[in-house]
């Protein structure tokens, strides 16, 4: 009888300030998209686990909301708590920074990381966007002095550059353990949650600078239909009447584009036909009300 093959499994937190490319890195590490991305900061509002199983190795990545100093609204406070609490009980932290930029928010993150017992890997993202390459090496030396990093790796998550190096380091730091999830799992989140995230991503991509932080999505219906697909009803909540008009657009043009793009992404993710209907409703003050936020699925606890 052959010896049982050893398996390795571990949790890896991906942290950093808003808009440094954490979700793009997660998607690249997984080889497919599960965490929404946009060029706007704070696209990620929830912690999302991405699961990558390859042979005996299962890496469970935790993509976190961006840590930031500003906590003016209840939603910002919850997002900060969600990101901070992800740092407990992980085997490794990947700290993502952006090119040659270093901000007060980066400083705040590194201050939190210094007290951790687990190793911290520094990923310098978007190095392909650094126009003056002579600044890169001195900046890497500056970053190396901030704390005792396990390693410092320059990457481009968007282009996949050196992401395999990150994955290799992750595998080396995984403890011997049974896998937590079946090998075909790519996330711990439900299809209903992923549907709401896909709609929110399209809202952020197609609407103006201000609106996305006053908008959230609630899935009111997610049911299989007789054709082997899904009927999905999404409720888009905004804070003001003017925002509702912005989401709907002239003669419904904007919400039609958002709905079409979201449906196509859902069909790719769920590998089934989707019938999607969207509504827009005004619910003033939702982003300042912790009780309302929790009812909409915003929480600082892992689900």
Curated annotation (Swiss-Prot):
It comes from the Bacteria. Residues 63-66 are annotated as: G3. InterPro entries: G_ERA_dom, GTP-bd, GTPase_Era-like, KH_dom-like_a/b, KH_dom_type_2, KH_sf_prok-type, P-loop_NTPase, Small_GTP-bd. GO terms for cellular component: cytosol; plasma membrane. Keywords: Cell inner membrane, Cell membrane, Cytoplasm, GTP-binding, Membrane, Nucleotide-binding, Ribosome biogenesis, RNA-binding, rRNA-binding. It is found in: Cytoplasm; Cell inner membrane. Residues 155-157 are annotated as: G5. Residues 125-128 are annotated as: G4. Residues 42-46 are annotated as: G2. GO terms for molecular function: GTP binding; GTPase activity; ribosomal small subunit binding; rRNA binding; small ribosomal subunit rRNA binding. Signal peptide: none annotated. Residues 16-23 are annotated as: G1. The keyword Transmembrane helix does not apply. An essential GTPase that binds both GDP and GTP, with rapid nucleotide exchange. Plays a role in 16S rRNA processing and 30S ribosomal subunit biogenesis and possibly also in cell cycle regulation and energy metabolism. Belongs to the TRAFAC class TrmE-Era-EngA-EngB-Septin-like GTPase superfamily. Era GTPase family. HAMAP family: GTPase_Era. This is GTPase Era. It comes from Yersinia pestis. The lineage of its organism: Bacteria, Pseudomonadati, Pseudomonadota, Gammaproteobacteria, Enterobacterales. The gene is era.
């Amino acid at each position: 009888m052959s010896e049982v093959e050893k398996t390795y499994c571990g949790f890896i937190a991906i942290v950093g300030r808003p808009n440094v490319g954490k979700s793009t890195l997660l998607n690249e590490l997984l080889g497919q998209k599960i965490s929404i991305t946009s060029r706007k900061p704070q696209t990620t509002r929830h912690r999302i686990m991405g699961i990558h199983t390859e042979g005996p190795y299962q890496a469970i990545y935790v993509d976190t909301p961006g840590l930031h100093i500003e906590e003016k609204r209840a939603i910002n406070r919850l997002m900060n708590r969600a990101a901070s609490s992800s740092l407990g009980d992980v085997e490794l932290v990947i700290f993502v920074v952006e090119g040659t930029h270093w901000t007060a928010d980066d400083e705040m993150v590194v201050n939190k990381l210094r007290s951790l017992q687990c190793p911290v890997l520094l990923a310098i993202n978007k190095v392909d966007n650094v126009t003056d390459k002579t600044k890169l090496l001195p900046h890497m030396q500056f970053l190396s002095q901030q704390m005792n990093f396990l390693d410092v790796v320059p990457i481009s998550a968007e282009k996949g550059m050196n992401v395999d190096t990150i994955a290799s380091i992750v595998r080396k730091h995984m403890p011997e353990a049974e896998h937590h999830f079946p090998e075909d799992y790519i996330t711990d989140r439900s299809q209903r949650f992923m549907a709401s995230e896909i709609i929110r991503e399209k809202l952020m991509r197609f609407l103006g600078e201000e609106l996305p932080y006053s908008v959230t999505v609630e899935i009111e219906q997610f049911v299989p239909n007789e054709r082997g697909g899904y009927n999905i009803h999404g409720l888009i909540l905004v804070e003001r009447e003017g925002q509702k008009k912005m989401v709907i657009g002239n003669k419904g043009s904007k919400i039609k584009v958002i709905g079409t793009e979201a449906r196509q992404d859902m069909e790719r993710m769920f590998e089934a036909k989707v019938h999607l209907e969207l509504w827009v409703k005004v619910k003033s003050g939702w982003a300042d009300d912790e009780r309302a936020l929790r009812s909409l699925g915003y929480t600082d606890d892992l689900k």
